[in-house]
């Protein structure tokens, strides 16, 4: 099971960032640093909510507290930076774990660089960002590397889901008994 956050309220600041797996090998003799890219990198997002009315605040606060108590994952629908036009429902993709390329099949309009999408494999959502689109071969270059091998899997551009756990303390602020903010970080777990 998973717990899905409500619609992101206006004024919310979401700061996505890549959690890298691998590392940098720094030469002890002054040579160039080598970047080791490994399968397993994933996204996290810092979420900072604005001042909310009590009902909305209670809904947002209940989600991470419920997930913490049950051990369920949280789902945050990532807002698209580019929304016009979104690729249609029914776009499917196939790729190989460890690759950063995904072949897609479906009608126009095509995905664009900078668009978030997610797909589900084995009951888990995997979030990716489109880096480049080859319209001739219908290949997407994505970040991070694919952690699983999707096969004719539905790509969700309308509601891209970051699924994971809160990786920070669950805390909120009250000022004169008014909910004035809530900050947390959610990190993909699959």
Would you name each region that the model predicts?
Residues 1-190:
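Extracellular/virion structural assembly segments
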């Amino acid at each position: 099971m998973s717990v899905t956050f409500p619609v992101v309220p206006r004024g919310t600041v979401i700061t996505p960032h890549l959690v890298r797996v691998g590392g940098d090998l720094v030469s002890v003799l002054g040579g160039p640093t080598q970047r080791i890219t490994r399968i397993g990198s994933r996204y996290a997002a810092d979420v900072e909510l604005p001042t909310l009315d009590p009902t909305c605040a209670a809904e947002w606060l209940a989600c991470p507290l419920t997930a913490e108590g049950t051990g369920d994952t949280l789902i945050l629908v990532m807002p698209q930076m580019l929304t016009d036009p979104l690729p249609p429902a029914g776009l499917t993709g196939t790729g190989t774990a460890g690759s950063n390329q995904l072949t897609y099949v479906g009608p126009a309009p095509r995905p664009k660089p900078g668009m978030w999408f997610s797909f589900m494999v084995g009951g888990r959502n995997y979030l990716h960002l489109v880096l480049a689109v080859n319209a001739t071969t219908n290949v997407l270059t994505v970040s991070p590397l694919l952690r699983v091998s999707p096969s004719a899997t539905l790509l969700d551009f309308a509601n891209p889901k970051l699924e994971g756990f809160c990786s920070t303390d669950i805390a909120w602020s009250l000022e004169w008994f008014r909910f004035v903010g809530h900050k947390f970080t959610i990190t993909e777990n699959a």
